[in-house]
Swiss-Prot record:
This is Protein IWS1 homolog. It comes from the Eukaryota. Residues 1-466, 643-679 are annotated as: Disordered. The modification Phosphoserine is found at residues 27, 54, 69, 157, 170, 172, 183, 196, 198, 209, 211, 222, 224, 235, 237, 248, 250, 252, 261, 263, 277, 280, 295, 306-307, 309, 321, 343, 345, 366, 368, 372, 384, 386, 408, 410, 412, 427, 458, 460. Interacts with SUPT6H; binds preferentially to the POLR2A-bound SUPT6H. Interacts with ALYREF/THOC4, SETD2 and PRMT5. Interacts with HDGFRP2. Interacts (via IBM motif) with PSIP1 (via IBD domain); phosphorylation increases its affinity for PSIP1. It comes from Mus musculus. Its main location: nucleus. It is found in: Nucleus.
């Protein structure tokens, strides 16, 4: 399709008539175009309403009427052809749209007329503005200009974005028909573009409004652009008039707002107005490049344009519309959607009025209309400026209210920053730390005050029972708290009955007696007398320390320090009695887990370590002392004493760590590192060959292995062994026993008959 549309030799299928015939048959082309346009509208019924279809047809008719002032047939043919061009090219470029399927039929019908008529007649109409007698030269220019337009329009078709509206007003008007595909939330912005469309009498603008979410800026941008398209249509060419304002921009008094700046402003407004659209960034970039290319391509056509006054008029109006769009973008960035919608609707109305005035001034070619047009546009811009200021004020007021209510905007992020600042220090940004939200301390104080007031007003004792206010404690609650504090020290009797009232007294008395006995033994040892006080008290101590219900109480009361006194050596460096050491080490093993603070303050660890390292200590006592030391030190190093929960790998690692250093070296291979057999077998590590470094050309003496084999090898004959074991365990089965009994009975029964006795003694049982 592109090759057919964009061929520069003006021949599509050979059915195209000469340019002069097209001029003569302009009305026929117009009728065909209106049919095709309505067909394309019906083809896009999925995206556009019937009202939009009627709007387009009315717009076409009005555009033809407005342009008939100079060249009736050429203008009608041109307008219709340019419109049909718009319908064809966007459909081809937007190959994804649903209209693409329907466009080829209408395209094939009107291709010759539309392609050649639009290009040639556009140029004719340009020249028609200057003089009606130059139409023959126009046909010559049409070929070259059609090539220029073709070069521009392939760019449009190649980029399937919504930006083609820029490269040509025709594309802008009809590329938005396929864009209705994209329209997902047309409800919000549809009314605005439709108002401007009905006023501007431009059929494509409803379509531009249909390209909502991604085109939502573009309804506005296409309004500013469609301001140009109606003028072009009034001036009998859409593709020609777009370069006219842009080329005149370079010559105008406001050169800084040339095509590039206009497109950039429109792009900026699009960025601001529609940040939600994902494709807006890519579209804007494409628009920039296409607009610049179009402006470069259309500069050649500027010589064909009519008076400079007509150029300056659409140029200034477009600049005003661009200013409005820039302000709209600022509004939508600063203000909320309501203010933006109001200003946009008014801007659309202003654009619509500007479009009407442009159609009139293009038809009349009068400078007075241009001046009135500019003044009307300036009035709309002034109104939009006031609206923008009001929207900005409203948005600033709303932002202040939000800050007063919810604190700063980044309050949620400040929590993490505050945490990091508390942990790692201040961040260094003093300005960011101006937190206007609520302080947690103030909130807690307000809560406490309100709760106090509620507690005073109400008769309930909920807060008092929770222990929040100690001033209101009753005698009963004080007694309960005292009981609860004492409950930790009391233990139940073995039978689970009543509390032992004298448990604490018994435990404390026992500890006092133990300390006294240890002190007396030290004094007797200093006097060179036998120290027998501990031995005499040992049975009583062992009896009480073995009671399960008193063990916790003993530990809490400080029995560990008393045991340390009993296990520590006497002043003459002699160990206490062997019986005392054995009994107390056994009791220490039976005691529940002891806290690190208790071990530290009591000093029991030093006493046990002294026994563990003492050369005269018995082997059994050393083993018990070593187990105690290991058990008490495991929590300090974060190790668990539950070996059942350990995996096999953990147990192997533990055994390797506890292995003596010499055996560990030998088990790992000694000084000579040995190759891993698995690596050798898998091929990762190749076996050494003669000539390789490290190869020894001699036989090796096999060395005994010092490794501890932890994993038992699997038994390969499990089934046979199980059968054998089962048979050996069960022995003779009941069936075998019954069979033997049966055979015995039969033998006996046989022997009951008469038996021939051999005289010689044969068959005699021995």
């Amino acid at each position: 399709m592109d090759s057919e549309y964009y061929s520069g030799d003006q021949s599509d299928d050979g059915g195209a008539t000469p340019v002069q015939d097209e001029r003569d048959s302009g009305s026929d082309g117009e009728d065909g175009v209106t049919e095709q346009h309505s067909g394309s509208d019906t083809g896009s019924v999925d995206h556009h309403s019937e009202n939009e279809t009627s709007d387009r047809e009315d717009g076409l008719a009005k555009i033809h009427n407005g342009t008939d002032s100079e060249n009736d047939e050429p203008s009608n043919a041109n307008a219709s052809d340019s419109e049909s061009e718009e319908l064809h090219r966007p459909k081809d470029s937007d190959s994804d749209s649903e209209e693409h399927a329907e466009s080829p039929a209408s395209d094939s019908e009107n291709e010759p007329v539309n392609q050649h008529g639009s290009d040639s007649e556009n140029e004719e109409l340009l020249n028609g503005h200057a003089s009606d007698s130059e139409k023959e030269e126009v046909s010559k220019h049409a070929a070259s200009d059609s090539e220029a337009e073709d070069t521009l329009q392939p760019q449009v078709s190649e980029s399937d974005s919504e930006d083609p509206p820029r490269p040509q007003a025709s594309d802008s008007e009809n590329e938005e028909p396929p864009k209705p595909r994209i329209s997902d939330s047309e409800s919000e912005e549809l009314p605005k573009p439709r108002v401007s469309d009905s006023e501007s009498e431009d059929p494509p603008r409803p379509q531009a409004s249909d390209s909502e979410s991604e085109e939502l800026p573009k309804p506005r941008v296409s309004d500013s652009e469609s301001e140009d398209p109606p003028r072009p249509q009034a001036s009998d060419s859409e593709s020609e008039e777009l370069p006219k304002p842009r080329v005149s921009d370079s010559e105008s008094e406001d050169p800084q707002k040339g095509p590039a700046s206009d497109s950039e402003a429109e792009d900026a407004s699009r960025h601001k107005e529609k940040p939600d659209s994902d494709d807006s960034d890519g579209e804007n970039k494409r628009e920039d490049s296409e607009v610049q290319n179009e402006s470069d391509g259309h500069t050649d056509r500027k010589g064909l344009h009519s008076s400079d006054s007509e150029e300056e008029e659409p140029k200034r109006q477009k600049i005003d519309s661009d200013d409005d769009e820039e302000k709209e973008g600022d509004e939508e960035k600063v203000a909320k959607r309501k203010a933006a919608v109001l200003s946009d609707s008014e801007d659309d109305a202003g654009n619509a009025s500007a479009k009407k005035s442009r159609v009139v001034c293009d038809a009349d070619d009068s400078d007075s209309d241009v001046v009135s047009d500019k003044s009307g546009k300036r009035e709309t811009t002034v109104a939009s400026d006031s609206e923008e200021e009001a929207g900005k004020e409203e948005s600033s007021v709303k932002k202040k209210e939000d800050k007063d209510l919810f604190g700063s905007d980044s309050e949620s992020g400040n929590e993490e920053e505050n945490l990091i600042a508390d942990i790692f220090g201040e961040s260094g940004d003093e300005e960011e730390e101006e937190f206007t939200g609520f302080n947690q301390e103030d909130l807690e104080e307000e809560k406490n005050e309100t709760q106090l007031k509620e507690a005073e007003d109400s008769d309930s004792d909920d807060n008092i029972k929770r222990g929040k206010h100690m001033d209101f404690l009753s005698d009963f609650e004080m007694m309960l708290q005292r009981k609860k504090s004492m409950c930790g020290k009391r233990r139940r009797n073995r039978d689970g009955g009543t509390f032992i009232s004298d448990a604490d007294d018994v435990v404390s008395a026992m500890i006092v007696k133990m300390n006294e006995a240890a002190e007396e033994d030290r004094q007797l040892n200093n006097q060179k007398k036998p120290a027998l006080k501990k031995l005499t008290l040992l049975p009583t101590v062992v009896m009480h320390l073995k009671k399960q219900d008193l063990k916790e109480t003993f530990i809490d009361s400080g029995v560990m320090s008393a045991i340390k006194e009993w296990l520590s050596p006497l002043p003459d460096r002699s160990l206490p009695a062997l019986k005392i050491r054995e009994e107390l080490l056994k009791i220490l093993q039976e005691l529940p887990s002891v806290s690190q603070e208790t071990l530290k303050h009591s000093g029991i660890g030093r006493a046990v370590m002294y026994l563990y390292k003492h050369p005269k200590e018995s082997r059994s006592n050393k083993d018990m002392a070593g187990k105690l030391i290991n058990e008490w030190s495991r929590p300090i190093f974060g190790l668990t004493s539950n070996y059942k929960g350990m995996t096999r790998e953990e147990r192997e690692q533990r055994d390797l760590e506890q292995m003596p250093q010499r055996r560990r070296l030998s088990s790992t291979g000694g000084q000579t590192p040995r190759r891993d057999l698995e690596k050798v077998l898998t091929g990762e590590e190749k076996a050494l060959r003669p000539g390789d470094p490290g190869f020894c050309a001699r036989a090796r003496v096999p060395m005994p292995s010092n490794k501890d084999y932890v994993v038992r090898p699997k038994w390969n004959v499990e089934m046979e062994s199980s059968r054998f074991q089962a048979s050996s365990k069960k022995g003779i089965s009941r069936l075998d026993k019954q069979m033997r009994k049966f055979t015995d009975i039969r033998k006996k029964s046989r022997s009951a008959h008469a038996v021939k006795i051999s005289i010689e003694g044969n068959k005699m049982p021995l």
